[in-house]
Each structure stands twice: as C-alpha cells, then as structure tokens.
A protein has these predicted regions:
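Absolute protein N-terminus
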Residues: 1-2
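Compact, glycine-rich, soluble single-domain proteins
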Residues: 6-106
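Acidic/glycine-rich phosphate/pyrophosphate-binding loops and surrounding catalytic core
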Residues: 75-78, 83, 89-147
Length: 147
C-alpha cells in the first residue's frame, strides 16, 4: 500500500507500508492491503504505520482518510493507496513533549471553567485539547519512549 499523509504545509509521509492504524471518528481504524475502499473522518490522535524497514508514529489533527485502489497497468499487481489529509501532523520525534503537556493543562483548565455556549469557540478548544493529547500520546508510543 502507498501511504500519503499531507497537511496544508505539505507532505509529511509518502511511503510504501504494510499496515496503517488511524484515529477514526468512531474509533481506531486499521487498514491492511486489500481493504475495501472507504472514506472516513479522523479525530486528533495517533496514526501509526508499519513499513518493511521501519515503523512510524505521527500525531495527527482532524481530517480525513481515504482508502482506494491505485491505478495500475493490466499486468501489475493491485495496490491500495491510503490518503490522509489532516489540518496538522507531527512525527513523534519532532514533538516537544513539555510544550504539549503545558497546552493540555491549559486546555483542561479552560474547559473546566467553560460557562459559555457549546459553539465554535468551544469546539476549537476541544480540538486544541485533542491536538495536545495526540502529541503526548505519540511521544509515549514512540520507540524508546520512557513509560
């Protein structure tokens, strides 16, 4: 399978993979070769993938995931493409754990004190909290992380 993970700033991952796990809106979603075509919403969380020579851990924001067959020549084997479009993403190795922890604590404090409507501002705060938690979770799941 071909995994392409893109943000508005550009491509973060573009590699052949054997497996992808992503944070779907309804729960964690696993994709293996031959998966049925689908499109689903993603929530902030951890996307992981297994390639032949390495594994990857990426914190992702909200977005979409699509699984579809790649175009191919008549004599070529079938391959799938996993396209991930998210508003933000960071490889686990590039995450500042302390900054994410501070942002999570601040978002939790603001949510606990929230007395306003459950409107766009509230939704933005929930997403900010989710992004901070996603980064902390990615760091915790990265190889060599202290547990």
């Amino acid at each position: 399978m071909k995994l392409s993970l893109t943000t508005p700033k550009g491509a973060l991952v573009d590699t052949d993979v054997e497996e992808v796990t992503a944070p779907g809106d309804l729960g964690e979603l696993g994709v293996l070769p031959g998966h049925v075509p689908l499109m689903t919403a993603l929530r902030p969380g951890v996307l992981s993938y297994k390639a032949k020579d390495h594994d990857g851990i990426v914190a992702v924001g909200q977005g979409f995931l699509q699984v579809a067959p790649l175009p191919r020549a008549a004599d070529a084997p079938a391959r799938d493409r996993v396209l991930v479009l998210v508003d933000q993403a960071l490889a686990a190795a590039d995450i500042d754990r302390e900054a994410a922890a501070r942002e999570l604590a601040q978002a939790d404090k603001e949510l606990a004190a929230w007395r306003g409507e459950l409107d766009g501002a509230y939704h933005a705060l929930v997403l900010r909290r989710g992004w901070a938690q996603a980064r902390l979770d990615a760091v915790a799941r990265a190889p060599g992380a202290a547990h």
